[in-house]
Amino acid sequence: MTPTLLPVPEPDLPRVLPVILAGGSGTRLWPLSRECHPKQLIELISNESPLSATARRLNGISNASLGDTLLLVCGEQHRVMSAAQVVGRAAAPRILLEPAARNTAPALTLAALDTTALDEDPVLAVMPADHIISDVAAFQDAIGRAARYAQEGAIVTLGVLPRRAETGYGYIQVGAQRTGRLGGQGGYSIGRFVEKPDVALAERYLHSGDYWWNSGIFVTRASVWLKAIRALAPAIHAACEAAWRAGVAEESFFRVDAAAFDACPSDSIDYAVMERLTDHPELGIEGIVVPLAAGWSDIGTWDAIWEIMPKDDQGNVARGPIVFEDTQDSFVRSEGRLVACVGMKDVVVIETADAVLVANKHDVQRVKNIVERLKIDRRPQASEHRKVQRPWGHYDSIDLGERFQVKRIVVEPGKQLSLQMHYHRAEHWIVVSGTAKVTRGDETFLLSENESTYIAVGEVHRLENPGKIPLEIIEVQSGNYLGEDDIVRFDDQYGRAVVQTLPPKPATARAAREPRDEAAERETVR
């Protein structure tokens, strides 16, 4: 089925508010994508992350009047990194923070509640943060066409004409072409949504021409979505409304209430609403699919990334220091170490500092099973990289033993860590470069290069960078438990949870634990 598109008339342009859903974890792209640093924040294809590219391509949507705000829905732990990647890329962002992942239907419901409270019911262009679009003009044109139908009360999804028999995508059965005033704008009724098919069924869909890939991009008026979700998934609507009403604004962030949101069921836009619209004609809401011919790809797996990247004459994709010998149709990426492949075909090799994936290219959908096993075994590689981004900078876990850990910590100029303490570990800090401002108990002092200090178990402390260049320190932790959840925060400028009262002064206990020569050394260093 080849759609015929006519120019969209100019009067009465819909006003479109872009909504980016950035709550995914990207487990099938492990070990590069991890829970604390998911795929939408990683430079997977180029020197730009998918989230940054998504925000940038929203500038100048054709056939619609773009509002002056971009709405981003993301997880609490990704808020600072996500905000940094959209600032300056598109309109000014307003960021809704989900305390827990609940799939796309609750995320869109929160966005619709937020916009109707602050606006006059705009048309929402809702899209995931992890798609690749090669033809931005065609994408913007499709959004503008879909917005025309949405303005009149439909919920519109963008469908992609399949290029191959893909088993990793959902499909939409395309119904009759829309007629009437907007009949020439490429819209079709939706027959049904189909889950990811097996290979034989995907081949049938490809050759029939009546089944398009489900892009996961939706266009709807905020009020229309709220009407649909209230009728078809009332528990989602009720929980999201309660969570939004009890939420707290903090500069460009809006933090929904965690306790209320905890009661929200997890469901997708497709399952909660789109698949059920035809069974509820009393709602008066039509589901429409508009074609998207813009070089769309959902980069959810390593084979999907291999598919769209430039290849050598043997069909190989290399990123990083890679050597191929008698190897074909493979994807190899190294974050540092040299990787050599000999006599291989259809393999994926991903090297990181603390984990290496080697997989058959046709089995990469099963990478998520590895991540689940790592979580069961409580391995840190399931959720964090060795190098971990924080609002104040980053740290790199250089070495880890049974009762010790060595970290390289970099604090950006003007940034500070939270005022905190640990119940199970002591810390030694050595300044490599820059100047450190240290709070330790009742003391505050500066440390310069080659100077050091000691933080005892249970001692309240803070590290700051008051200078103009990055502060780099080596931290040596020792204790019987070294997990990142052994942090009690008393003050934090990044909105992380804090306790309200400081503990009793630990001076006496510290003196009992600390050798006299270490105390003397600390006085000398200060």
Regions flagged by a language model, labelled:
Residues 1-15, 220-430, 435-453, 459-461, ...:
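Left-handed beta-helix
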Residues 2-21, 27-140, 144, 160:
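Conserved N-terminal catalytic core of the sugar/cofactor nucleotidyltransferase
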Residues 14-16, 66-68, 91-92, 119-122, ...:
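Short coil/turn connectors at secondary-structure junctions
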Residues 21, 127-129, 221, 292, ...:
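A secondary-structure boundary/capping signal
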Residues 51, 111, 130, 172, ...:
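Residue-level signal for inorganic ion chemistry
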Residues 101-106, 164-166, 199-201, 296-297, ...:
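A short acidic, often aromatic-flanked loop/helix-cap motif at beta-alpha or helix-coil junctions
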Residues 135-263, 281:
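Conserved core of the sugar-phosphate nucleotidyltransferase
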Residues 473:
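Noncatalytic nucleic-acid binding interfaces
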